[in-house]
Amino acid sequence: MADSKKRYLGIDIGSTTFKAVLLSEDGKVERTVYKRTQPVEAGKVACTGHCSGCGACGGGASKRLALEFLKVAGITSFKDIAAIVVTGSQIVEDTRKFIPFDFQVSEVTAHVAGAKFLHPDVDAIIDCGGQDSKCMVYNPTMKLWTSMMSGVCAAGTGSFLDSVAAKLGVKIEDVAEKVNYDSDTEFSSVCAVLSATSINKFKNRVPIGDLLAGACKAQARTILNSVGQLLLNAPGRKILFQGGVAFNSAVAFFLKKLTGSEIVIPQYHEVMGALGAAVIARQLHDLRDSGKLDLAKVEYEPTRGKSVTLRIKATRRDFFSSDKSKPLVWRNL
């Protein structure tokens, strides 16, 4: 390292983006990165059910992105980081072969930690990413955070707006400035497919600003329909809106209009999960240094629930290689 100061790394690997935050010894954000990930090229991955560590998959790509991120900060190795904590939907047990993390935390834990780091008094959070939406609300009576995650529909996620922007030929970063905020155009907020069908039907008859307004309103309604019920008992409270979708201020505008609450888009909103992971990494290092926690005695072994194991056994299909000696890949169908 260029100096003896300790740094803490938080990494959040989601379905569409790679996020990382480097935190200094005194708790300041030194660097951040928010980068869209790319699908693995066909034919490059040849694993046979077990990770070979070749690095051709998403795990290898994440390692390369993380090392590039650290290199800009003058750090050449993961060994120069005091503690690494990871989170995100794409973190799997084989991720450790590529990124030697010390601890893994849930997305909810990471997002709350990041939000409280910047806004200590926060008690309501909406996070909207590429794959799902989450709502987290603090219950002062029970002194704990309650959370809710959206279902499988893409309508309340960043992927929906990506597809709408592509369909209309608009760059996703230009959507907010092209929205007609006075438009009364409405689209279905029940299903992403129905919304896309409606947009396709009207795109040659309705101004693009109205179409984008309808899409952003549909997105805001879907977020609230899927996870917003946690906010029903506390109308008018300040809500932190974070995640990649918060780049689109139009969605925040319609969330405010629908809820009547103050919607705050915090600094580092796009990397809040990674920021929370970095904050936890700093806390983890302090506990380890003080002797209150010995990670060497904690066995890291992700386990799946019994019901999930039974379902996988019941639905697995083996696709055999040409010599029939072992599966080429395993699929859950």
Predicted regions and their residues:
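Gly/Thr-rich phosphate-binding beta-strand-loop-beta motif of the actin/hexokinase/Hsp70
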Residues: 2-26, 122-141, 333
